[in-house]
Amino acid sequence: MKYIPPLNFSPVVSTDVSLYRSGYPMPLNYSFIKHQLHLKTIIYIGDKDRPLEEYQSFLESEKIKYYHIFMDSSRDEGIQERMNQVLHLVLDVRNYPILVHSNKGKHRVGVVVGIIRKLLQGWSTAGICQEYGLFSGGMKDGVDLEFITMFETNLKIPRNVIPGFAKHCLYLNELEAAEGSDDESGSESILTAKQPI
């Protein structure tokens, strides 16, 4: 059988867990998703109100959890909170394997992946910009890249659900936080945007 991945499909993380990015899956991609990815969760970052009917049927038949995080652009009001929602999903190992997709797999997913690269993988700004440009066909949206660079968060994440790939950056944050605190609760990690970029 021939498998066809969705537009702009690529792995983001493939270590202890699998996180993928893409454009909107079409029916010709469903076999690939079913037989190659074995997804538990799909996060749609976009402006469509609801999934297409056949897509909804596919999600239900495969028992894939579907989350819609509305995003028109990185200029949206409330975008900070929406990115935090995405991070909460990505930082819970029980949701994996995960596919994060937008309509074309370029700008909106590029913002999400850029934030993941920055906060959870310690990538440099140059690396994030280069990857963003590759998937957007060389069209680098200065507003998106500025949003990624300036993005800050302060999420509390239960330690027992954090995927292995994110633990190193979270550990570095804990060391920084511990220098100025006597709190030794130990049950949560705090995700901050303090990695050098």
UniProtKB/Swiss-Prot annotation:
Domain of life (superkingdom): Eukaryota
Pfam families the record matches: Y_phosphatase2
InterPro entries according to UniProt: Prot-tyrosine_phosphatase-like (IPR029021), Siw14-like (IPR004861), TYR_PHOSPHATASE_DUAL_dom (IPR020422)
Phosphoserine carried by residues: 181
SUPFAM superfamilies from the UniProt entry: (Phosphotyrosine protein) phosphatases II
GO molecular function, one term: inositol diphosphate tetrakisphosphate diphosphatase activity
Tyrosine-protein phosphatase domain location: 10-160
GO cellular component: cytoplasm
The keyword Phosphoprotein is assigned to this record: yes
Free-text function comment from the UniProt entry: Required for normal growth in the presence of linoleic acid hydroperoxide (LoaOOH).
Family: Belongs to the protein-tyrosine phosphatase family.
The name this protein goes by in its record: Tyrosine-protein phosphatase-like protein OCA2
Species in which this protein is naturally found: Saccharomyces cerevisiae (strain ATCC 204508 / S288c)
